[in-house]
Every structure is written in C-alpha cells, then in structure tokens.
Amino acid sequence: MPRGVYLGFDFGYKRIGVAVGQRLTCSASPLSTIEAKAGIPDWNTIQKVITQWNPQALIVGLPTCIDDRELYTTSAARRFAKQLHKQFSLPVHLVDERLSTVEARGYLFEQGGYRQIKKAEVDSIAACVILEQWLQQSE
C-alpha cells in the first residue's frame, strides 16, 4: 500500500466529517465538517479539500448496526462513496464505522466534559476514528 496522505469521511445527511491521515504514523487528524442538505454533499467544498490534500485514496465509514443489519444511512453512504470515486477518480474504501461516533463523543467528553461535545467536532473526530481504523487494518 503506498505511503502518503488519505482522507476519511463520516457521511451524514446534515454533516460530513472529514479527517486527514498518513500511513507512516497510522494516525489521523480532524480537518473539518462539510455541510450537507438532505444527504446532498457540498461537492465544491469536497473538491477543494481533495485538491488541497491530494490523497492516495478516500475512506468512507459504512454505518451498520451492532448485529450487522444495515441502517437507512448505509445505502446513502455507499452512494456517497460511489460518487466520490466517479467524480475524483480516486480509490474509495468502505470501513465499518460501528461505534465511531460513540468513540468520538467519549474522546471529546474526556477533553472537556459535556460542554465540549459539539456536533461538528463529533463528525470530524468520527472521521478520524474511521480513517485510523482503516490505516491500521490495511497495513
């Protein structure tokens, strides 16, 4: 697997968390949260992020239930991944994102309690969790 920069996405109908990571350290950092309207991403902002970071691949979290059932957002996340590949001609990998939001909320709570938990930050931290999981699994 090539060393380099990777972008992770936590897809949601209202917000899409974005993180950047690298294979060398298998770590990721939150970048931003991109607004979406009824599940339609702001493709111009996504284009800017991809142009700025020039990633090797894109990693998208795939929401599923604890018992492996798919959620209503699962098919939307798959469509988002397909659109990313079609628009940017980059490899796109899907990662089981089970409990990534719970982990992100826990991290933010540890940093400053309940008041520290802001929805936009949760989404970008969840994208970090998703991306780091993929980086560690694909090594």
Swiss-Prot record:
UniProt keyword annotation of Cytoplasm present = yes
* Keyword Disulfide bond in annotation: no
Mind telling me which GO cellular component terms the entry cites?
cytosol
The domain of life is: Bacteria
**What EC identifiers does the entry list?**
3.1.-.-
The UniProt GO MF terms for this protein read: nuclease activity
What UniProt keywords apply to this chain's record, in alphabetical order? Cytoplasm, Hydrolase, Nuclease, Ribosome biogenesis
Q: Which SMART domains has this protein been placed in? A: YqgFc
What Pfam families does the record tag this protein with?
RuvX
Tell me a GO biological process for this protein: rRNA 5'-end processing
What compartments host this protein? Answer: Cytoplasm
Major place of residence: cytoplasm
Q: Which family does it belong to?
A: Belongs to the YqgF nuclease family.
Function (record text): Could be a nuclease involved in processing of the 5'-end of pre-16S rRNA.
Instruction: Give the HAMAP family listed for this entry.
Output: Nuclease_YqgF
User: What PANTHER family does its record include?
Assistant: POLYNUCLEOTIDYL TRANSFERASE, RIBONUCLEASE H-LIKE SUPERFAMILY PROTEIN (PTHR33317:SF4)
Protein name (database record): Putative pre-16S rRNA nuclease
